[in-house]
Swiss-Prot record:
Disulfide bonds, paired cysteine numbers: C44-C59, C48-C66, C60-C67
Protein name, UniProt field: Penaeidin-3m
Signal peptide: 1-19
Location in the cell: Cytoplasmic granule
One of the GO biological process terms: defense response to bacterium
Positions carrying Serine amide: S74
Main localisation: cytoplasm
Record InterPro entries: Penaeidin
Organism: Penaeus setiferus
GO molecular function, one term: chitin binding
Claim: Disulfide bond is one of the keywords in the record: yes
Homology family: Belongs to the penaeidin family.
Length: 75
C-alpha cells in the first residue's frame, strides 16, 4: 500500500513539473555567452538605408563598398 501511495505521489509530482516547469535552483535558464553578431555578405548588396552603421563599416573595409549620404554605395 505504501508503495502504491509513493508511486502515485511521484507520478503526480512529475506531471505537475512537466506541465508547469519546476521552479528550483537547478531549473533556471542557462545564460549564453555574448556572441558578436556576424555581418552577412548579403547585407552589402542592399541599399545603404537598410543596413546598420556597423554593417556599412564592415562592407566598406571588406569589400570596398562604402556608403555615402544620399548616394548609396560607391566602389
Amino acid at each position: 500500500m505504501r508503495l502504491v501511495v509513493c508511486l502515485v505521489f511521484l507520478a503526480s509530482f512529475a506531471l505537475v513539473c512537466q506541465g508547469q516547469g519546476c521552479k528550483g535552483p537547478y531549473t533556471r535558464p542557462i545564460l549564453r555567452p555574448y556572441v558578436r553578431p556576424v555581418v552577412s555578405y548579403n547585407a552589402c548588396t542592399l541599399s545603404c538605408r537598410g543596413i546598420t552603421t556597423t554593417q556599412a563599416r564592415s562592407c566598406c573595409t571588406r569589400l570596398g563598398r562604402c556608403c555615402h549620404v544620399a548616394k548609396g554605395y560607391s566602389g
